[in-house]
Amino acid sequence: MSDPELAGQVALVTGGGRGIGAGIARELAQAGMRVAVAARSREQIDKVASEIGGIAVEADVSDRDAVSRMVSDVERELGPVDVLVNDAGIAGGSDAKPMWEEDPAAWWHVFEVNLLGTYLCCRAVLPAMVERRSGRIVNVGSGGAYLPPRPGMVGGTAYGPSKAALYRFGELLASQLAGRGVAVFTISPGLVRTEMTAPLGADAPWTPPELAPRLVRVLAGGRADALAGRYIHAEHDDIEDLIARAEEIREQDLNAIRLRR
């Protein structure tokens, strides 16, 4: 069923060819949005776009020129981006190797995709959003940013830090956008079983895959704009309760990930 506040709006979902990103693309299409699905794998995004009646845009989010072309293509075919979902990400390995045996170039590439890619995508859509005084950005984080290490955890020493930086980036960006009509959120989807996380095994505490897409749908609709800049967990946070407590959350500085003394 479509949502009146979202019907006809344009969403761009990076990393939308599979896993969590594909689920978000499907959810936003069901809400009535016109969805652009972006990723490096043409076959994957073509499949999802065909399924939801959207468009597929092949792009490497770590490449500034590619991101500019991606946004231009979406604007030409669908119109200005109303909602950007930054889900594109890579793990870059496992914890099998100690840090001193990791390839520095591969380690840094995780940051180029997970953090720089998010930065470049935000940078590409924000001028138009700020000019219109309307827009929403949802950055998809990970429990790898703050959970204790565990056997089989993906990404070696790169993935978790890249996602931790993403939370802080979202908080700072939201502060810069305050009063400009654009809301930025960072979510944790929980431990969703995907190709990236499958090595954790059947006994891992898996999160239902539909929770993150449902949360993104609520955030995209605007009712949670008072929570801009906050960290929201798809499984452990009740978004309706958070919306009702938005003033308290702001006043008491809740739902923020920070190092504490």
Q: Where do the language-model regions lie?
A:
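C-terminal helical subdomain
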Residues: G179, T186, A202-R261
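Substrate-binding pocket helix/loop in short-chain dehydrogenase/reductase
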Residues: D95-M99, D103-W108
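Conserved glycine-rich cofactor-binding loop
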Residues: G17-R18
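Catalytic loop of short-chain dehydrogenase/reductase
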Residues: A91, P104, V138-A165, G170-E171, ...
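The beta1-alpha1 cofactor-binding region of Rossmann-like NAD(H)/NADP(H)-dependent oxidoreductases
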Residues: A59-M70, P104
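Conserved glycine-rich Rossmann-like NAD(P)H-binding loop of the short-chain dehydrogenase/reductase
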Residues: A31-K47
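A short, exposed helix-loop element centered on a Lys and neighboring polar residues
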Residues: C122-R123, E171
